[in-house]
Amino acid sequence: MEPPQKKILKVFDQDGLYKTMVIEPSSTTGEICEKFAKKLFLEDSEVVQFSLFIFEGGVRHQLKNTDFPFDYLIKYEKKDYKFFFLNPNGEFISFDKDKQVKKSQSASTSGSAPPKKEPPKPQELQQKQHISKGKSGWLLRKRPGRYDKLYSVSKADKYLRLYENEDTDNDPLYELSLENSIIELKQDLHLQLTLGNSERYIFTHESESEIVSWAQELQATMNYTPGSSSSGSKTNIIKNSSPMGGMLMGGGGGGGGYIPSTKDLGVKLQSKAENTTTLVSTLIQWVNHILEGKGIKVEETEVLSAFSDGIVFINLIEDLFNQTISYRKGKSVYEMQSNIDKCLDVLKTKCGCDYGKILSSDVSECKVAKIIVRILWSMFVGYFCNCEGKEFNMRDKLISWCSTIVLQESSKQIIVESPSSLRNPMVFAVLVNKFAGSTTLDFNALQKIKSKQDQAQQIIEAAFNYLSIPMVVDSSFWNDDQLDEKSFLIYLSFYYIYLSGQEEEKSKFLQSCINPRPSVEPEQTISIRDKQLKLMREKKEEEDRLKKEKEEKEKEEKEKLEKESSAAAAATSSIASTANSNSTEPPKPTTVPLKKTISKLPPRKLPPTVSSPTTTTTTTVPTTVPTTVTTTTTTTSPTTSPTLTPKQPIGTTIKKPATAPLKLKPVAKPLPQPTPSSSTSTTTTPTTTPSSPKPTPVPRTPQLEKEKQDRLEKARLEKEKAEKEEQEFLKQQQEEEEEEQRLLLEQQKQQQEGQERLRKEEEEQQQQRELEEKQRQIDEEEAEEEARIRELEEEARKSKERLEKARLDKLAKAQKEREDKEREEKEKKEKEERERKERKHDENDMDTFKLLEDIVSSSSSPTITPPQSLHSSQIIRTTIEEDDQTNSELEMFQNEYNRLQDEEEHINSFLKLGSSGSNNSNNNNNNNNNKSGASSVTESVTTNKHKSIDILSDNSSVLSSLDDIINSIDKKTSATTSDSFNLSTSSTSLSFLPSSPDLSTNSTFTTNNNNDDETKARSLTSKARKPLPTLTKEQQSIIDKQTGLVSKQSTNNESNEQQQQQQQQQQLQQQQSSQNSTTSISTVNPSNLSINNEEKEKESEPHKPPPKNTQGRVVVRICLEGFGDVLFCSFAIGYDTLCGTVRDMVIKKMKVSSTEEFEYSLHIVRDGLERVLDDDEILLEAEDKIDRFVFKKNDIDRRLLISNHRPVSSK
């Protein structure tokens, strides 16, 4: 395991002094402040509160206690920055102890001294500092899109309780522990409370002073806690372990550090194990397990596209939350987004899933797997918590259950206190042994396995075989680079649901997921006409059903009334018979107290269809019998029964049973009263009887009285019942009418909505079709445009080829004309030169003959006069000079030949040589032939000179062989001239033409030319000459003397010429060695060769790029890393300079020590990737336009590179 990275943190004061500390990436600002406080104020009696600030570019920035200064050191590595300590008043903390003492003394006198290091005693606390007894009041809690008004209570027990109202006797809605919490007052006057378990609550208040007061109160509540003291004090001050801990922003006066110590923030600073790839795999396996029975399976490689149409979400919602969503099956964007919108709405409103701010377009056009992961994770949390909880509730529930079982079974060997504890696969091994049997897994053998992956593999297989726990996770998830706590929680949830016994319904469902079942079917799309017909049919069926129900109800009511009327008639007849029997036996008059009349509610107002009340006439007739008879006559007008429906035919009457006659107790002697004539009722006429004493009343038995009262009560109840039924019927009828009206309106509204929806759908489909049509047109136009562009490009290419061909033809023609013209001019010049030489040669011959004639003519004289000897010596000198001139001309032709070879090499360097070996051999043969020709010409000239001189020096045969010698000289001179001519013609052909494989025609051409030249030379020299005169001995001796001098000069000239020939041969050998790659020399037709060369160049162009220019130097910039302010250096190098040479140049220039040379190397960076250049690699061949060269150390992190070459900052 690699050691942790470390850096040195320098903190300065205002005087330039600084303190250093070695920090790690996990070191927080609070921890650093705490350690510096121990260093600075360990021996002092008072502690100064301070915070860590960074000054960069004139800007001051305060670091929170949860920030990591290590990140700032990396961020500002190449910038000018400094760290300082500042107190809450914004003053710099000085590292000079004298200044600290002076400052503390001045602060103590002025009353602004910092708090003491030791907490005050309880007795002193009452005098110096006020202890808060708690605070209560209303606070506004910020929620998504709203504020909840809660009654808040803070006491000295480190808890903040939130109630729905001011009644604090009930249980609070929230009970927040302030232990290890973070309290921050933001600039926008929002109080942010972060608990020890990372839960965050945001509060505010309408009053600014009130929210500041709450912040101070919560801080006091967090810092003061009740305790036991022998002195009777109730509270002790707990000093905040952080010396500064951050400042309360907006609180005024810079008071209060509201951050706990770094030890208390261990949970917050703990690195969470998160891996998106692992979580995606786990969630996909979870989804596949749930939807296995429906035949739906999602591949991990298709996460971005499998959920785009929403069908998988719809089936999951139906299985997990029993919420059926109607959807449309299709692949258009409108249908997919419509389905996803429905799913997201149901998840948020009915399932309690908090997936954040995700739109349907984010899912349908998904480009990041985290969007799908967030939705699936929210569905898992909502399903586990029954649509009511949050993620932390689910986490606490699982961890507490697992911790309890593991603690019991493992005897405290394994402790589960957070999701990070699930990184140990032995936790699941304990659960398997607990519920499947203690012998299922060999716990000791598993612990001996070092690989967590191997342990997890055995545990997962055992859980699947013995407990049927789905294998939603893989054993590779326990590797260090694939750990994910959420995946382990999902796997643990199956153990909890299957084995805890608290989630039986979920357990049955998850175990039955593999059973086949139908998936959610999409809604059928029908046409507008079919929808209208369907609505009309439904409307007609509803009307028929209502009509039938109405008829059945009327029929039932009618039968009920008939039964009631028959029962009433039977009751009336029984009452009448009873009354007759009672009248035959008149009872004795007795005094019976009247029963109190039973009160009843006043009759409700009847509808106008009810007839008027009956008319009753009561008469009392005195008779001889001492009884009072009361006759009641009732006249009933025709009425309509209140229970009948309004649609009953008019005129039909239903007879109600007459009420029983009411017998009243006589109060006084009744007087005779005449009955009105208009009355239709029957009356009794009074009869006169003799006066007699007052008769005693007939006593009534209690049974009769009771029966009477029962009858009256029964009649009253029947009447009330009839009235009530009538009112209920009318009310029901009215309600039915209203319901019919409402249904009709709803049907009309639904019909209108359906038509509107159909119209919108048609418009959307029309728009979609228009968009598709436009897109199709655009695609067609683009295709046509591309075809037209291709045609134009093809035409341009063809025209370019035609122009190029015409240009090449024109150049070839011009080249051919130029070559013909040059050849004609050269032939003309050579012909003139040859004629001039022949004329000169003839003149020399004439002079020779003349000299010989003069010698012969002067033979008669005894001696040769000095003028004659001088003249003869001049002739001999002239002959020698001519030979020298011939040699110089041969040398000139050889030089010209060398120059033409150089030009040929320069021209042929751009051509690709087909057969270098054969050409080299031909070239060598031609060079050897040329050398041998030149040497033979030179030797012939020298031999000619020797022969002519020998002839002249020979006394015996001068006259006889002089003619033969002159003829031989002429022949060899002409041969030399012809050889020089052939050499010149062959050289001129090399000036602009390369070699050609057609050598037979060229050789015949040269041989023909040579033969023609030889014949011409022989014709010119074969002229008739005069016979030479004979010489005497005296003349021969004089000539011998002259020729002796000439022979000495000739020997000297011969030695000089031999040296020149040796030098020329050496030069030719050097040229031959340098021309091994050139073509053989041959006289070829210039026009044909020029055309062949152009064709070869065209063929070789696409296969071989033109040679690079390897001459000159270029400037290369090398970037430097680890050399402080020196960022780059430049060098002028050649095209063939090696990377090792450049590396040595950089090492020498930057003065790298010999001990560190092997650590540096030269890198090439391309597109963010880099590689090390080898020392034997050419630098400029590895370069591209987008590359750059970097010189740095190998395999060393840049953040750890502390270079010795970095200049020490004066600051």
UniProtKB/Swiss-Prot annotation:
Signal peptide: none annotated. Residues 132-223 form the PH domain. Residues 5-90, 1112-1196 form the Ras-associating domain. Residues 566-596, 607-646, 655-668, 676-691, 744-753, 914-936, 976-1010, 1049-1083 have a biased composition (Low complexity). The keyword Coiled coil applies. CDD domains: CH_SF. The keyword Zinc does not apply. Residues 528-565, 703-729, 754-778, 786-853, 1093-1104 have a biased composition (Basic and acidic residues). Residues 103-133, 520-941, 973-1110 are annotated as: Disordered. Residues 103-112, 862-877, 1032-1048 have a biased composition (Polar residues). GO terms for molecular function: GTPase binding. PANTHER family: HEAT SHOCK PROTEIN 26, LRRGT00202. This is PH domain-containing protein DDB_G0287875. It comes from Dictyostelium discoideum.
